[in-house]
Amino acid sequence: MNVFSEIKDAIERAPRNSYVAELHLQVIKFAEVLENVSGKEFCEKVDLKSAWGTEFTKMKKIAKRLRAAGLDPKKI
């Protein structure tokens, strides 16, 4: 399974009221792999509306700071 499929599956399995939180967690978890992926490409690969590209970009930036502070993304 590729990273985009894994993210899409996780988002689809999330409870309706946790959809956005799951999206954020998945981007943080896979931020290093997604480093060179644009918001547009991410949305296309995960079948999200293009507006989610902004959230994707924000979470990639936050992920760098979280990793620098000691977060282990493998535990997400």
Q: PLM ranges: what are they?
A:
Residues 3-29:
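Short, Lys/Arg-enriched anionic-surface-contact patches
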Residues 40-46:
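Short alpha-helical "recognition helix" segments of helix-turn-helix
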Residues 50-64:
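Major-groove recognition helix of helix-turn-helix-like DNA-binding domains
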Residues 60-76:
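Short Lys/Arg-enriched helix C-cap and helix-to-coil transition segments
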